[in-house]
Amino acid sequence: MIRQNFNADWTVEKGDGNSRMNSFLGNTQTKTVHLPYDAMIHEARTPDTKNGAQTGFYPGGEYIFQKHFTAPQAWQGKLVSLVFEGVYQTALVYLNGWLLTRNVNGYAEFTVEAGPYLKYGADNLLKVIADNSLEPNSRWYTGSGIYRPVRLLVGNKVYLPQDTVRITTREVGQGFALLDVTAQVQSASTVTERVTLQQTICREGTAVLTDRQNLLLQPGESRTVSFRYCVDSPALWSPEDPNLYTSTMQVLEGEEELDREETRFGIRTLSIDAAHGVRINGQTVKLRGACIHHDNGILGAATLPDAEERRIRQLKEAGFNAIRSSHHPAGRALLDACDRYGVLVMDELSDVWNVRKNPYDYALYFEQDWKPTIQKMVAKDYNHPSVILYCVGNEISEAGSESGAETNRRLCNTFRELDPTRYTTNALNGLMAAGYRLREIMGDVMRKFPAQPGPSGGDGGGSNALNSFMSLMSGEKGDYFATHPLLTEALSGCEDSCDVIGLNYLTGRHVLEHELHPHKAVLGTETYPADIVRLWRIVEENPHMIGDFTWAGYDYLGEAGCGIFHYDGGANFSSIYPERTAYIGDLDLLGNRRPISYLREIVYGLRKAPYLAVLRMERNGQTSSKTPWMFKDNLSSWTWPDFEGQTASVDVYSASEEVELFLNGASLGRRAMVDFTATYSVPYTPGELKAVGYTGGLCDGEFTLRTAQDAQMTLTADRKTLQANGEDAAFVMIQFVDANGTADLHTKHTLKVELEGAGILEAVGSANPCSEERYDTPESETFDGCCMAVIRAGEAAGEIHLTVTADDSVQKQLTILIQEAEC
């Protein structure tokens, strides 16, 4: 079977439901693009968009993608299919005027059969209408268009259907592993066919084993063929050592190869139970988890493989060993990256079932679409060793009802039938699941915790109903709410049918659930970042607690303002333009680690050295808004020009017993650590601020901040060589650093980026959560001293020359080599 990338030479134009008339009148503007392509990121944001803050004020729309191609005569009589990994929201696929399919799930992969509609030896027109015009339809930034890759499949008379080679680790013993391999072989022939199915398993290019079976296939027959192997001295896959193998399954007719399917997989066992937690190859692993959305920051939703790999690599380097695909099936490139870096995956079905959260969301189609979506999801995930959990839903509104419990049971059972090797969960939110019980629960909470009047005699400074609900999910109120008997009643139906009990913002139940369900593992499927000390203590002290997933690991577009610090009286969740990002990730929109990330790494036990963070001095004396998702508005910087003599609030994060802080060599005293933190008030003086940790009286780590002196612009690319495939990408960080390597995070600079040569300037932007700058223009202002340019390779070899001009004066240049693409 031919399996090839089908991403090149597309055109896109904006539609409005009347594309034929617009084309006739010449009212369209077409652009040639290389997929994946997100059309939403190129739209102008407006305060009055129907999506509001949910998408960061980006509007949706209808987009018409077209591609002309020639179908060789040799394809005639063969199975010709097109695989679309993701088109948002609704996709209508036409070939030469024929409607091939309508797909309603913007996150689900789908396949169309093209053969009967092709013109062989002639020009063909493939048209995809990506309709994201029914708004609002999502609680976060979705992107629009064909934002994931497209593949072409051309099958011979006998072939291996996509995703039908399955490799299962049955047992791992001392020096061996038992594997079961199954393959579905399909005959499209009108006569009996005699073929050989040959299996080869390789590790790092060296064959480990080879086997074959001879088959006699009747016309049109589909057969499942099984192999069983014992692999000697296997290199096992684990988060710490993610060894991968390659399976090559060939269909041979004599010496002719009719088809070939290559599958990367890992040899590992998986078990989850209340006594031992998650075990990979018999070893217990606590899940250090990050919830992530699918966008790639300033790229929007375009799923470039290099962007997905970069994101997973950065999360792993920050101490995470697991991600949750929130709230939809993960893309293939993301799963591939997780396999390579040893990051475990909770793959998720949907944010809604049959009750809407937005007027035009997936709830409109869920009942008729969930089963094929699960089938495709499992087929996609099965051979990925990183995938360990299927999450059937997120904060489902009907979870506390009888009908919701029954839906949960059907979903979990379907996952188990299709994949008995993995486990199911549901990310349950108490506020959503409580349903009709919520009024009574809230009454009990308010009687237990009477409202405290604010300074003006009001309700705490004018907090609205949303803030009142949010307060139920944190602190003592949150624990009382979480453990309320009526909430236990509401959650019981879904909890009974899941393998793992998943809880969103219900920390008070993490221990209680073991009393109620002693044989079930429990997981914090979504939790507040600032609660990591308490959360991780519960995880470490309780075998049934298998891990914690923070919201969120990486900042993202949409849900704008959830974590933005308002010092002007503004309130979070108030849909304030031009807010664009949630601003609550451990890593910011560009992938820079924020102070909460280092605290988390210390709490995890992965970092011995202390870490220093300073509250933004320009906000001294000011009071900000606050939500449970927010940590502190601080930076790891000792460069605060114009604030000499003013008091800086300095946090030291450390796992040591005590720390000592030094300013320009003078001790500011030792302090015992409380919840991994010690806070100092320090008069700001430029120079050196150093923290030293002590345990048992001995130094066990130190960390130093220095004031930046005469910082100069630097350009740092994560890659200097790209393939000329139209999809490779380099991420260029633009910072201002002095001769000692100290970055100036304070001074703002206006940047202009220019590119010449064999590539495309795909995006330019900063991590500023509240900016009107576009990401598809070459200009940007730094935020916290940083900006980023994303360079995408073209389809011809050559060089890319990048020039960045700062403040209309200083220039820096960078060259990236574009090599011929590998076949």
Residue ranges and their predicted role:
Residues 2-19, 36-39, 54-161, 204, ...:
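Accessory beta-strand-rich segments of carbohydrate-active enzymes
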Residues 4-5, 11-20, 152, 390, ...:
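Substrate-binding clefts and catalytic carboxylate motifs of secreted carbohydrate-active enzymes
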Residues 41-71, 75-84, 88-104, 157-166, ...:
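Active-site-adjacent substrate/metal-binding segments within catalytic domains
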Residues 114, 227-236, 679-684, 778-795:
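Short, hydrophobic beta-strand segments
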Residues 119-121, 182-273, 685-686:
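Extended acidic/polar, glycine-enriched regions
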Residues 176-216, 225, 648-666, 688-693, ...:
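Beta-strand-rich binding/interaction modules
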Residues 193-198, 239-246, 647-649, 655-657, ...:
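Short flexible loop/turn segments that cap and initiate beta-strands
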Residues 260-265, 697-709, 811-819:
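Edge beta-strands of extracellular beta-sandwich domains
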